[in-house]
Structure formats: structure tokens, C-alpha cells
Amino acid sequence: MASSQQVNLLSCENVSKAFGERPLLRDVSLGVSKGERIGVVGRNGAGKSTLLRVLAGAEPPNSGRVTRGASVVVGELDQVGTSAEHATIRSHVLGDRDEHDWAGDSAVREILTALLGGFQSEQLDRRISDLSGGERRRAYLAEQLIREVDVLFLDEPTNHLDVEIIAWLAAHLKGRPKIAIVTVTHDRWFLDEVCDHMWEVVGGNVEEYVGGYS
């Protein structure tokens, strides 16, 4: 939970969400403030991903409301990821940024190198549809890390990543302390390394704890 002395970048009030007759969230009220690192845990099917999607604005709640500051920018990595059928890595990850702009940005080059193996034309001009599942996942993650956001929602960000890249990702996120991060992951090491708060989704409620997973 955000400190009473901190202003929430994003919050939900009395949010409920169900699929069919099955309630996943019941009257949940939470807030996310600048720089918080929150891990979302719970049993499979408890509603962890649903909570992230509702907070990110990807799904509407059945009742209650989600609010964010007028200038707050949100990024989201979901478990699936989508892109235009013929989009290239370049267009999907870098958008319409001029090459001289991103190529001169050491942070962008680091992300492209760590996740995509480099930023040469033959690498960036590959189609997303031609990539393996793991390569697509890394491309979607690179897109979110390159964006300038205030709150970043990550749903199973370590899926399809090897241990070296997971370690790089943890260090990268720790090196960007101004971004608030809310992540669902089964990777206990990642939770302990990155997160300082836990939200446990249990029976439609969200219980909050200070500290990492362990």
C-alpha cells in the first residue's frame, strides 16, 4: 500500500470483477505510488492477471473505479502480447522514432542488445510473426522497457528468459527507481530481488505485505 505521505499515481476504489458467475475481485481498493515495486502473488486462477489488466486499463471493472493522474503514463506487458501480422521488430519496438534518435540513446542500445542480441538492421527488420515464442516475448518486453512510463505492469516477465537475461532484467529495473512496477511472476528470486511490497490475491480480496516474497 502506498504511504499516506505519498500521492498515488494510480488507484482503484471498491473494484469488483467477475467472469461469468465466478468473482475474481471483490471490493478491492489499492494504490500505486512513484517508485513502488509490488509483486502480485496467489494461486493459479486467483485473479492476479485480471487485477493487473484492470489496473492498467486493459479491462473495465464490473463495479468501482480505477483512476490515474492526468499525466501518468502506463505500460503493460501481458502474457500474450500482440502486434500487427507483418510488423517488424523495428516498427513494433521503436515505433516511428528516427534512427539517429534511438541509436544515440545508450539506454535503448543496452535494452536492444540484452533482449534482442543487438540493433543491426538485419536483426531489427525481422518480422514479429517469424520469431519464436521466446524471441517474441523479448521483443514485447523491449518495447515496454524503452517507453517512458510512470507505472509498468509486468505479467510473468521472466517467461521464456534464460537466467542471465532474468538477472539483467532485475538489475535494469532496480536501476530505474522512479518507475513504479507491479508484477505477477512465479519466479521467487525475481520477486525478492525486485519487489519491496507484496499483494496476495486470495478469495477475491487483496492482502498487502511489506517486503519481498521470502
Labelled PLM ranges:
Residues 1-214:
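ABC ATP-binding cassette signature C-motif
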